[in-house]
């Protein structure tokens, strides 16, 4: 609604408003706040948001939905495999776990480098950027509180959801 009122390009500016940084920021904060209980819920929320990044986010950017994009996206397969491991309570091989951690650290560096390059090409207004950033971190929790009340959530699950909804826009939105 905010983007519509401001007459902004929904395909370019909706993903940063609806897809927060639940992975790199949200998971560690939830782990700190709620321990391993919060980590599980935060990871599940982050997985759903990542799926939205690589489906809804791509759909909005291209303005055309194609299942090819979904089937060509490695994170989608990684999440499916992770869900299968969790569902069947399988032990992750040590070499796979170690490799995943190493790739994670390398990926964070590459994503931040890509973000820096992408931001040099953006033309933006400081006023609009501040307004949209505040909209993201204010509207997310407001909507989350409505959801928490509607579904009668409580305890650490409600807290984790609230923390995750308050995260700023994710780097993936700008790449």
Model-flagged regions — what are they?
Residues 1-175:
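Alpha-helical transmembrane segments of multi-pass small-molecule/ion transporters
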């Amino acid at each position: 609604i905010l983007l519509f009122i401001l007459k902004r390009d929904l395909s370019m500016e909706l993903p940063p408003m609806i897809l927060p940084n639940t992975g790199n920021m949200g998971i560690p904060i939830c782990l700190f706040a709620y321990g391993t209980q919060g980590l599980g819920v935060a990871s599940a929320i982050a997985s759903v948001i990542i799926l939205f990044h690589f489906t809804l986010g791509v759909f909005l950017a291209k303005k055309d939905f194609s299942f090819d994009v979904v089937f060509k996206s490695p994170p989608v397969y990684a999440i499916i495999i992770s869900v299968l491991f969790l569902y069947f309570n399988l032990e992750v091989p040590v070499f796979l776990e170690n490799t995943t951690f190493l790739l994670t650290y390398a990926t964070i560096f590459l994503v931040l480098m890509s973000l820096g390059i992408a931001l040099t090409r953006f033309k933006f207004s400081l006023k609009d950027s501040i307004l949209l950033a505040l909209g993201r971190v204010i509207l997310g929790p407001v909507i989350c509180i409505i959801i928490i009340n509607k579904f009668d959530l409580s305890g650490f699950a409600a807290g984790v959801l609230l923390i995750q909804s308050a995260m700023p826009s994710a780097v993936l939105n700008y790449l």
